[in-house]
Amino acid sequence: MNDYLIKAINASKDLRLLTINGKDLVAEAQKRHDTWSASSAVLGRSLLGTLLLAGAELKGDQELTLRLLGDGPVGAAVVTAKSDLTVKGYVQNNHVALPAREDGHIDVKKAVGKGWLQVTKDLGLKQPYTGEVPIVSGEIAEDLTYYLAKSEQIPSAVGLSVFVNPNDTIGAAGGFLLQALPGASEELLQETEDRIKALPQLSSAFLDGMTPEDLAKKILGDDSKILEKDEVSYHCDCSKEKYAGMLETLKGSQLKEMIDEDHGAELVCNFCGNKYNFTEAELQAILDKKLGK
């Protein structure tokens, strides 16, 4: 199991921590979308952050979608994770590379820009719930921390990191989500905050072989306890049947136009790049069904 997420708790059971190694799933996304460095960093951090939220909040058949609606060159990022810890996502502009910051790191803040962060939860109720906050940083981890504080009133700390190699492949990807539970003292929170500040640069640490278990001990201490360890993966659940269902929602005139003028249709999944081709006959069958023939 290369990519996995762990859930841990401190000895006094008033801090909950999720840590993740997601190098392979971010690499899969990079390969599917052919993203360049800045686009990879934005997409990778969004994938990791959404998985951490899903791991903390979802159960059953629930799912969660993060939308990062920034005005930077990468444009919007859309990521959906399910309770089984599968994730899929895309950015609006795949081919964005920016000059490095003075410290040599990718300028994610500039790539994202200003705008809004939305989190939509489909908890199996009648209507999905959406929380929205302004993008306060653009680094994504800080924006998720702000979202959790403002929209969900949960004192949290989020760290996310993606290392992109010079050839645009993914060298490392990981992160954490720390949440205070009822009863956590100010002294404990300050002590834990100091530990987080003392952490090595996350991407370098993951490159050097740090595991989610190692990261948990660095944040919570050696006496912390691991509660769960679950595999995480990039997985798109698109299918030709789903796209046929989408075509059925179009107006009859639109389907007729596809048949008469385009002589078929090719639909491309934003999340994974899979292409689905529909022949004239298949489109005609969808139109006939729609018209009740």
From Swiss-Prot:
Main localization, broad class: cytoplasm
PTM per Swiss-Prot/TrEMBL: Under oxidizing conditions two disulfide bonds are formed involving the reactive cysteines. Under reducing conditions zinc is bound to the reactive cysteines and the protein is inactive.
Signal peptide per UniProt: none
Keywords: Chaperone, Cytoplasm, Disulfide bond, Redox-active center, Zinc
Classification via Pfam families: HSP33
A single GO cellular-component term on record: cytoplasm
GO biological process: protein refolding
Subcellular localization, as worded in the UniProt entry: Cytoplasm
Cytoplasm as UniProt keyword: yes
GO MF annotations, alphabetized: protein folding chaperone; unfolded protein binding
Disulfide bonds: 236-238, 269-272
InterPro entries linked: Heat_shock_Hsp33, Heat_shock_Hsp33_C, Heat_shock_Hsp33_N
HAMAP family documented for this protein: HslO (MF_00117)
PANTHER family referenced in this protein's UniProt entry, alphabetically: 33 KDA CHAPERONIN
Family: Belongs to the HSP33 family.
Protein name per the record: 33 kDa chaperonin
The species this protein was found in: Lactobacillus delbrueckii subsp. bulgaricus (strain ATCC BAA-365 / Lb-18)
